[in-house]
Swiss-Prot record:
Residue sites binding [4Fe-4S] cluster 1 per the record: 12, 49, 83
Subcellular location(s) of the protein: Cytoplasm
Protein family (similarity comment): Belongs to the methylthiotransferase family. MiaB subfamily.
Protein name, UniProt field: tRNA-2-methylthio-N(6)-dimethylallyladenosine synthase
Length: 474
């Protein structure tokens, strides 16, 4: 009887990417088939996030629900991974001794051996070490699931913002070798992927070693990925302003595959708060980056992250953030009230903004950005938008749905052969959470750039053993 795997994932896109890799890995090594029904699983994994408030308690609450199944099914294996696992380590076992495996973001590739050890009679396995980039060498080939895909190009962060736990839970910055990244992208392109989203905690700090001993910058990587045939839309997340160099802006000027949409976290519009956060830039320097971008891409839309109620934030400083939001004209945001993360420098600062004040500021901030986003959507009425078709519409299976460069959902009448391809749509209606339109051009009429085939990239970047035989991680 086929055994089942259930993974519950919290947090960022990096965690989503890691969970997908875990599922592929354990299917190839142990034949574990992924299930959405946790009760059916033989292996239960919790991939955690430590960014949000009370992250640890959320983990133990979930584990408490799983404990009853462990009592009923003694052979059930329970594992905890992700950033909370990295942060808490053995403490998880102290509070929840029924947990079999504790693994960090950098040791997920060792899960097959950990499972073997538990099945071999070992009571528990804990490995939350930081073996740099080793995990990418031990994961199976990527499998495309639709026309879009994420590709992790680096891990960790060296910025040590005072409120953030990432450097402590995912380690410092380590970039994947250039050929490894291109090989994965080419494999996905060969399977029909049309949009790639490059991932990293500080993605634009990428400095990947090349086969000849050099270093590939993030700007160079963007151009190389965009040159692979079939990859006609390119995104990246999450970037840091102090790494957003002019050579990256130059890519926006000459690489049409790079979308006119950027997520660039700023956190606050007040310089004193930015200094206390150890962000390394001022509000004016942030706006300077946006001005340069809009000079080469006048239509680019910007989203950001904001923390309101950081220790010591005054009403005047919050207004500076609101002014920045208006000046930049952000399209959307991920915004949160400040809550201290244990072990970070900011946790030692007096948290002197009341919860009521934090919530009020958050409401005002989100209301302003929502209003700005609505104006952007209304301005799209009557315009022509390029849409990547993802599949049937959730609202009407007789229609198709896709996304624009600026992440708007568009529903329209089309044919099944359009799925996984681009179409140009004339926007005819604007709704709160979606747009409607009519097809005016199919992909065959677009003349998309053709430069190098995925197969040629695969041949050039595949790894070989000492006999010159190609090696593929299976």
């Amino acid at each position: 009887m086929t055994q089942k795997l259930h993974i519950k994932t919290w947090g960022c896109q990096m965690n989503e990417y890691d969970s997908a890799k875990i599922a592929d890995l354990l299917l190839s090594t142990h034949g574990l088939e992924l299930t959405e029904e946790a009760e059916q699983a033989d292996v239960l994994l919790l991939n955690t996030c430590s960014i949000r408030e009370k992250a640890q308690e959320k983990v133990f609450s979930q584990l408490g629900r799983w404990k009853t199944w462990k009592n009923e099914k003694p052979g059930l294996i329970i594992g905890v991974g992700g950033c909370v696992a990295s942060q808490e380590g053995e403490h998880i076992r102290e509070r929840a001794p029924f947990v079999d495996i504790i693994f960090g973001p950098q040791t997920l590739h060792r899960l097959p051996e950990m499972i073997n050890q538990i099945r071999g009679g070992k009571s528990s396995v804990v490995d939350v070490s930081f073996p740099e980039i080793e995990k990418f060498d031990c994961l199976p080939e990527p499998k495309a699931e639709g026309p879009t895909a994420f590709v992790s190009i680096m891990e960790g962060c060296n910025k040590y913002c005072t409120y953030c736990v990432v450097p402590y839970t995912r380690g410092e910055e380590v970039s994947r070798p250039l050929d490894d990244v291109l090989f994965e992208v080419a494999q996905l392109a060969d399977q029909g992927v049309r949009e790639i989203n490059l991932l990293g905690q500080n993605v634009n700090a990428y400095r990947g070693p090349t086969h000849d001993g050099g270093i590939c910058t993030f700007a160079e990587l963007l151009r190389l990925v965009a040159s692979i045939d079939g990859i006609d839309r390119l995104r990246f997340t999450t970037s840091h302003p102090i790494e957003f160099t002019d050579d990256i802006i130059d890519v926006y000027a000459d690489t049409p595959e790079l979308v006119s949409f950027l997520h660039l976290p700023v956190q606050s519009g007040a310089d004193r708060i930015l200094t206390m956060m150890k962000r390394g830039h001022t509000a004016l320097e942030y706006k300077s980056i946006i001005r340069k971008l809009r000079k080469v891409r006048p239509d680019i839309q910007i989203s950001s992250d904001f923390i309101v109620g950081f220790p010591g934030e005054t009403n005047e400083e919050f207004e500076q953030t609101m002014n920045l939001i208006a000046d930049v004209n952000f399209d959307m945001s991920f915004s949160f009230v400040y809550s201290a993360r244990p072990g970070t420098p900011a946790a030692d600062m007096p948290d002197d903004v009341s919860e009521e004040e934090k919530k009020q500021r958050l409401y005002l901030l989100q209301q302003r950005i929502n209003n700005q986003a609505a104006k952007f959507s209304r301005a799209m009425l009557g315009t022509e938008q390029r849409v990547l078709v993802e599949g049937p519409s959730k609202k009407d299976i007789m229609e198709l749905t896709g996304r624009t460069e600026n992440n708007r959902i568009v529903n329209f009448k089309g044919t099944p052969d359009m799925i996984g391809k681009f179409v140009d749509i004339q926007i005819t209606d604007v709704f709160t959470n979606s747009l409607r339109g009519d097809v005016i051009r199919t992909e065959d009429e677009m003349g998309l750039r053709v430069e190098q085939s995925p197969q040629s990239v695969i041949r050039r970047t595949r790894k070989e053993d000492e006999l010159g035989v190609g090696k593929y991680v299976a």
